[in-house]
């Protein structure tokens, strides 16, 4: 699924999805949720006006979705891709959540920021909500990012999270399509792994057979610095992090701290949700 607010950023995320999954047979849902547009209308002062404005915005949403669909089919024709348009009167987070569960989505691809978000923020408010609460992998595409095949993938890990096979299969398929190298980066001043960590490391090996795996270790204590340095030094195309309790990502996904941490991500960012569904 690719949520859209019809901004250039949202269309850029859709373009990335079409290119990164160009070898896969996909059903791509392009979804626009428009409740906020209805309630933010200055002329909406009486209940009697609600249905009129809602209908007007609904028709406009459907027109815009058709334009997006025509444009993406024109730019990226692909017989493996089938598209479905969804126009919904609801909040973005609720509509994404409902559609993820109804259609058993494999991934949500969206821009890090929408049309109206503050450019000084790493993530817009809608993207933050989706990253935090949707029980499905989310791939966030930075503003203005020009597509590069994900040949070099950074996957920081402490080898303590019990990963899910379905989400690892997603990474395996993506890496297999592009013969990617996955850099498994262990960030810890203590190099030696416990038996549990060794078992989880082996599980990753077994679950990612299509990729070339590199197991790296850094003794850098600051995780942000470690990740940022590695992205630059190894020319990384895609960053993968796992959203689980007490993880680095959980700390990062706080609106009050995300921009203080300083991880200003300029490459696509895949969040795997360590939640069962």
Regions found by a protein language model. Give the residues of each.
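Charged helix-capping and loop-helix junction motifs
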Residues: 123-126, 198-201, 253-258
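Glycine/threonine-rich flexible loop motifs
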Residues: 117-122, 249-253
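Intrinsically disordered or low-complexity boundary/linker segments at protein termini
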Residues: 1-12, 80, 107-112, 118, ...
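A short acidic, glycine-rich active-site loop
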Residues: 49-63
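Structural beta-alpha unit
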Residues: 70-108, 208-239, 243-259, 263, ...
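Active-site phosphate/pyrophosphate- and oxyanion-stabilizing loops and adjacent acidic/basic residues
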Residues: 128, 172, 202, 228, ...
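Small/aliphatic-rich secondary-structure junction motif
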Residues: 1-50, 152-217, 236-238, 264, ...
């Amino acid at each position: 699924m690719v949520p859209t607010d019809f901004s250039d950023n949202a269309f850029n995320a859709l373009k990335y999805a079409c290119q990164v999954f160009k070898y896969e047979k996909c059903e791509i849902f392009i979804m626009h949720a428009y409740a906020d547009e209805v309630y933010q209308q200055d002329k909406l002062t009486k209940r009697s006006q609600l249905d009129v404005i809602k209908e007007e915005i609904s028709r406009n949403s459907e027109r815009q979705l058709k334009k997006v669909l025509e444009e993406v089919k024109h730019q990226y024709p692909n017989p493996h891709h089938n598209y479905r348009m969804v126009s919904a009167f609801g909040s973005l987070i609720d509509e994404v959540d409902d559609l993820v569960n109804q259609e058993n989505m494999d991934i949500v691809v969206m821009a890090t920021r929408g049309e109206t978000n503050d450019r000084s923020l790493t993530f817009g408010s809608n993207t933050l909500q989706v990253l935090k609460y949707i029980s499905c992998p989310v791939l966030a595409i930075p503003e203005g990012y020009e597509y590069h095949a994900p040949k070099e993938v950074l996957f920081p890990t402490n080898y303590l999270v019990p990963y899910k096979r379905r989400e690892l299969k997603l990474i395996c398929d993506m890496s297999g399509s592009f013969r990617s190298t996955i850099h498994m980066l262990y960030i810890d001043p203590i190099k030696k792994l416990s038996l549990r960590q060794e078992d989880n490391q082996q599980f990753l090996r077994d679950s990612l057979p299509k990729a070339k795996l590199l197991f790296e270790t850094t003794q850098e204590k600051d995780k942000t610095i470690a990740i940022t340095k590695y992205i630059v030094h190894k020319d990384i195309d895609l960053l993968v992090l796992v959203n689980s309790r007490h993880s680095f990502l959980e700390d990062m996904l706080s609106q009050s701290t995300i921009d203080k941490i300083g991880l200003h991500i300029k490459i696509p960012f895949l969040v795997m949700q360590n939640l069962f569904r």
